[in-house]
Amino acid sequence: MGTIYLFRKTQRSLLGKLAQEFRLVTADRRSWKILLFGAINVVCTAFLLTWCSSTNSMALTAYTYLTIFDLFSLITSLISYWVTMKKPSPTYSFGFERFEVLAVFASTVLAQLGALFILKESAERFIEQPEIHTGRLLVGTFVALFFNLFTMLSIRNKPFAYVSDAASTSWLQEHVADLSRSLCGIIPGLSSIFLPRMNPFVLIDIAGALALCITYMLIEINNYFAVDTASAVAIAVMTFGTMYPMSVYSGKVLLQTTPPHVIGQLDKLLREVSTLDGVLEVRNEHFWTLGFGTMAGSVHVRIRRDANEQMVLAHVTNRLSTLVSTLTVQIFKDDWARPVLASGTMPPNMLNIPEHHVIQMPSLKSTIDELNPLTSTPSKPSSPPPEFAFNTPGKNMNPVILSNNQMRPFGVGYNYGTTPYTTTFNQGLGVPGVGNTQGLRTGLTNVANRYGTYTPGQFTQFRQ
């Protein structure tokens, strides 16, 4: 039998969770204005789609897609209000700011997909151009233009405002900027209006309405229906060119990349951190954009053994907090170990020294372990104590004991016979032609002491 839960917590459905979050957003009065504009947008879009069907105009359909994009921007603004109300949770420890980025990315990508659909339909119309009815073409153009401008200028959309300023300029903005400079050279008084970077959404709304007005005039004068398809292609290309830089910027934020314009500032701050008192090395640094205008990062700092961890942590956080709002700093103390040779009383099983050879093994630490890891910041070597040295056995390394069961004459001090090669490494120094020596013979017995902890002859006892 399974475990019986008397008060089991009920699982809410997805619709129930969405309804709960929607009630949380609507509790704020600032969101009522967004909801009102959203309702008007749905009604206006429905009328425009009906007029697109009655006029059979592909250009008006492409322009109506901008009204649908306005609906996505209103939803993004609503998500922005929701993010400000939510607090970080165990699942989303950095907060919910990335939902804003995801909403902007989804809105711009959907707008580009709509532009590609218009290009596909326009390519089919170039083969067989249908007749265009201009009865409601001009009315639909001005209704869409008025509503788009009114929505963009009335609702403060923080995510799209940040992306439009931070992303690279579109080709439409660059061409308009060139024309504005030429115009301001003739009329200097217009420099305050045209020279600043224009809002890309307002620019595409005006450019699309201008293309529809030209289409209306050419169809009314010459019945030139192909201009409607050409205007649809122009509006689709302008839409794609305007949305592409924003989707690229928001996509890079979702991929947790570091903005190029702050890399130099971060390198300067990391160099300042590496020169702080007690800091030996700064490594494993990683910084990324958490949301629009907020950065997060993590860094590992290696400090001296005698340094104050809290003081170093406070200084590092103070230096990096100017750019990184959410920062994780891990402090590591310098991990050097003092090597000490084995000293002390001899084990009982080593009293019969002539039956054993004690060979001190070299250090198992390789040269690769002594190298500092490559980091983007310079490391400062620590100052080891005078008795510290590399490639020496540690204090916890026991000597290796190899048994020697070869018979020897009792009571004779030295045997001057010739040692065969088969017994070279059983007794003595292992040099051919040298007699068998009794007792302990290693390469270190007659060497002067370097470390002060090993005394010659400590283990060299003889049994007479």
Curated annotation (Swiss-Prot):
Record's GO cellular component terms: Golgi apparatus; trans-Golgi network membrane
Membrane topology category: Multi-pass membrane protein
Side of membrane Cytoplasmic, spans: 1-33, 86-98, 156-200, 245-464
Residue ranges crossing the lipid bilayer per the database entry: 34-54, 65-85, 99-119, 135-155, 201-221, 224-244
InterPro entries: Cation_efflux (IPR002524), Cation_efflux_TMD_sf (IPR027469), CDF_SLC30A (IPR052005)
Keywords: Golgi apparatus, Ion transport, Membrane, Transmembrane, Transmembrane helix, Transport, Zinc, Zinc transport
Main location: Golgi
Compartments, as annotated in UniProt: Golgi apparatus, trans-Golgi network membrane
GO BP annotations, alphabetical order: zinc ion import into Golgi lumen; zinc ion transport
Topology Extracellular: residue spans: 55-64, 120-134, 222-223
Superkingdom: Eukaryota
MF-aspect GO terms: monoatomic cation transmembrane transporter activity
The protein's assembly and partners: Heterodimer with SLC30A5; form a functional zinc ion transmembrane transporter.
Family: Belongs to the cation diffusion facilitator (CDF) transporter (TC 2.A.4) family. SLC30A subfamily.
Known function: Has probably no intrinsic transporter activity but together with SLC30A5 forms a functional zinc ion:proton antiporter heterodimer, mediating zinc entry into the lumen of organelles along the secretory pathway. As part of that zinc ion:proton antiporter, contributes to zinc ion homeostasis within the early secretory pathway and regulates the activation and folding of enzymes like alkaline phosphatases and enzymes involved in phosphatidylinositol glycan anchor biosynthesis.
NCBIfam families, alphabetized: CDF (TIGR01297)
Record-given protein name: Zinc transporter 6-A
Species per Swiss-Prot/TrEMBL record: Xenopus laevis
Lineage: Eukaryota, Metazoa, Chordata, Craniata, Vertebrata
